[in-house]
């Protein structure tokens, strides 16, 4: 259990393969049992210990949960609401929604937060290679959409 949590909480997106390896470790330990599973546990523990570290997603989910607790009274923006009935459509549910998969790179500039939370940033990437690359990709997409 602790290896799974360490892979996600302490390593996170700096090395997403760590979570895959930890999950396979968990399954393998159950399949093999003691005493041989100590080898599997050791391999996984060393991999995690020597992997790049990042807790940025851990911090982001905590920040998001705290924000949700404080702002749960705010309504979901109308354009994000499903409109399964005629009345909901008439009330503007789903109007002006932009389906990201209809746009280049499956990305579109669109507000997903209530207006009161506009410009709220929940995720701050760590300064590791993988997260910096992801941040650059997002910045490039935003810039392309703003042109």
Each model region followed by its residue ranges:
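Terminal-proximal interaction/regulatory segments of ATP-powered molecular machines
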Residues: 1-107, 111-147
């Amino acid at each position: 259990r602790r290896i799974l949590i360490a892979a996600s909480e302490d390593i996170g997106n700096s090395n997403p393969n760590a979570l895959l390896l930890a999950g396979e470790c968990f399954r393998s330990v159950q399949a093999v049992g003691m005493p041989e599973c100590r080898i599997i546990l050791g391999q996984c523990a060393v991999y995690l210990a020597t992997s790049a570290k990042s807790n940025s997603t851990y911090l982001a989910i905590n920040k998001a949960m705290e924000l949700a607790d404080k702002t749960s009274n705010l309504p979901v923006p109308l354009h994000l609401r499903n409109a399964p009935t005629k009345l909901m459509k008439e009330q503007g549910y789903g109007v002006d929604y932009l389906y990201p998969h209809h746009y280049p790179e499956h990305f579109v500039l669109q507000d997903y937060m209530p207006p009161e939370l506009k410009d709220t940033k929940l995720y701050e990437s760590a300064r590791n290679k993988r997260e910096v690359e992801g941040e650059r990709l997002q910045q490039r997409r935003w810039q392309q959409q703003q042109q």
